[in-house]
């Protein structure tokens, strides 16, 4: 099976890395085209477009200016180790063993507004460009129009290489909307993580994001072969809830966190 996750806004280009066989992003020509579009915008325009502070807008304008090919280990960092949000706290790439890292390179993909689809060991230079950004570009009015079928076709290629017809969706709606289910050669399985709050089970964003990372880690370490194997996930107190689940949506519940 192939799993997809969202990227993170926060980045880590400081911490130590293990020895890794890094790779190049496969849609770099597209990324370069988008960087050129973003370079035409002033920091103020970027700030307005992305709804970020002047300080962050200045930082990201500078990142687009400094972005350059070729990528190497001095100017870029493997994607799985560069993102630093709640999903990546759950994934905890720094503690994965070499076998799990190898599995990740085959079975985990990171969706990206700038790079399209990243493998975990693909080098990336720092950026901020969320998939939902309404960026005018040569192919349309937003990034969904820009990427079109390209992301889905790349996932199809990865699924074919795995000999798999199952895609595990661990991404947010914003990012997974860049995947075209009608073009995808796979069944989509979406794990949902619910936490108890005042006697009700509901999705709490902070916990759910971390749980998606934990599920990605489970896939890399346990190598589930089937959807039923995914139901064995029990990290951090979550357990599969048959009654709330359906064929395509696996619901995991957890008692209230005290």
UniProtKB/Swiss-Prot annotation:
Q: Which GO terms describe its cellular component?
A: cytosol
Pfam families reported for this sequence: H2O2_YaaD (PF03883)
Superkingdom is Bacteria
**InterPro entries from the entry?**
YaaA
Instruction: Enumerate the Gene Ontology biological process terms.
Output: response to hydroperoxide
Q: Which family does it belong to?
A: Belongs to the UPF0246 family.
The entry's protein name is UPF0246 protein IL2146
Q: Species name for this entry?
A: Idiomarina loihiensis (strain ATCC BAA-735 / DSM 15497 / L2-TR)
């Amino acid at each position: 099976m192939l799993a997809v996750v969202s990227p993170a806004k926060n980045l880590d280009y400081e911490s130590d890395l293990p020895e890794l066989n890094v790779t190049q992003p496969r849609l770099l020509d597209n990324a370069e085209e988008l960087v050129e579009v973003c370079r035409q915008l002033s920091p103020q325009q970027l700030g307005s477009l992305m709804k970020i502070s002047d300080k962050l807008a200045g930082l990201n304008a500078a990142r687009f200016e400094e972005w350059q090919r070729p990528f190497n280990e001095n100017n870029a960092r493997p994607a799985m180790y560069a993102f630093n949000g709640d999903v990546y706290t759950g994934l905890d790439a720094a503690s994965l063993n070499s076998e799990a890292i190898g599995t990740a390179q085959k079975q985990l993909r990171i969706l990206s507004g700038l790079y399209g689809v990243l493998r975990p060991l693909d080098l990336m230079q720092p950026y901020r460009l969320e998939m939902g950004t309404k960026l005018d570009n040569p192919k349309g009015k937003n990034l969904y129009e820009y990427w079109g079928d390209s992301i889905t076709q790349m996932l199809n290629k990865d699924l074919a290489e795995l000999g798999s017809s199952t895609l595990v969706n661990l991404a947010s709606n914003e990012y997974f909307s860049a995947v075209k289910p009608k073009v995808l050669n796979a069944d989509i399985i979406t794990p949902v993580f619910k936490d108890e709050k005042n006697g009700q089970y509901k999705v709490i964003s902070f916990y759910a994001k971390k749980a998606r990372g934990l599920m990605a880690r489970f896939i890399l370490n346990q190598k589930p072969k089937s959807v039923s194997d995914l139901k064995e996930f029990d990290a951090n107190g979550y357990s599969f809830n048959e009654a709330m689940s359906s064929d395509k949506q696996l619901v995991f519940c957890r008692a209230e966190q005290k």
